[in-house]
Design a protein with these regions (language model features):
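Short loop segments at secondary-structure junctions
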Residues: 11, 40-43, 51, 114-119, ...
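The catalytic Nudix box helix
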Residues: 46-47, 63-96
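A structure-centric signal for secondary-structure junctions around beta-strands
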Residues: 2-4, 33, 42, 57-58, ...
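A sequence-level detector of short linear motifs
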Residues: 14-17, 47, 151
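Acidic, metal-coordinating catalytic segment for phosphate/diphosphate chemistry
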Residues: 1-35, 41
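A glycine-rich, hydrophobic loop/mini-helix early in the fold
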Residues: 33-65
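Nudix hydrolase/Nudix homology domain
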Residues: 22, 59, 70, 97-178
Length: 178
């Protein structure tokens, strides 16, 4: 069954149209994308390795995330994507919204959650994720953009507004104005 995405305008208003994943977005339209930063209580961040068969960034390390399917909110998509890619089940109320960012073709919503899950208990998604690691947050920040470690918004350079939010979340802040 093909994956459908809802389309939005630049102001995030629904256009009441869908597009099939893989099709070119019509000019001036956007879809919803999500990223989920998972921290453990030691402050390490969970990274997953993209499968070698992925067309974009094969073998790179990233935080879990993906695209909202038609009819999903970004919060629902974040819960689904985290479960699909790692086997970590979260309820919407567990996710803390960190920020919204406008990317080329996507409205990206970033969330964070704290979960102590041993790597041996993760259920990686075949064809999408091949490995996982807990990395100290500072070490990850130092490696972001090195060609092997991706930023959450899929830019090669660190995303300036996001990193302070991740650090604040890691340090205990839980209230953000989006």
């Amino acid at each position: 069954m093909p994956e459908l995405w809802d389309l939005y305008n630049i102001d995030r208003r629904p256009l009441n149209r869908t597009i099939q994943r893989g099709e070119a977005l019509p000019e001036g339209t956007y879809h919803l994308a999500v990223g989920i930063a998972v921290f453990n209580t030691k402050g390490d961040i969970l990274l997953t390795q993209r499968a070698q068969v992925k067309s974009q960034y094969p073998g790179c390390w990233e935080i879990p995330g993906g695209c909202a399917q038609a009819g999903e909110t970004s919060l629902e998509a974040a819960c689904r994507e985290l479960g699909e890619e790692t086997g970590i089940v979260v309820q919407p109320g567990e996710l803390v919204p960190l920020l919204r960012e406008l990317l080329s073709g996507a409205h990206l919503d970033m969330f964070a959650v704290t979960k102590d899950v041993p790597l041996s208990q993760l259920a990686l998604q075949p064809g999408k994720t091949t490995a996982a690691q807990w990395l100290p947050f500072g070490e990850w920040l130092g490696r972001v953009g090195d060609g092997l470690y991706l930023t959450p918004s899929w830019h090669k350079e660190p995303d300036v507004p996001l990193y302070p939010r991740l650090q604040q979340y890691r340090d205990g802040k839980r209230d953000y104005i989006l």
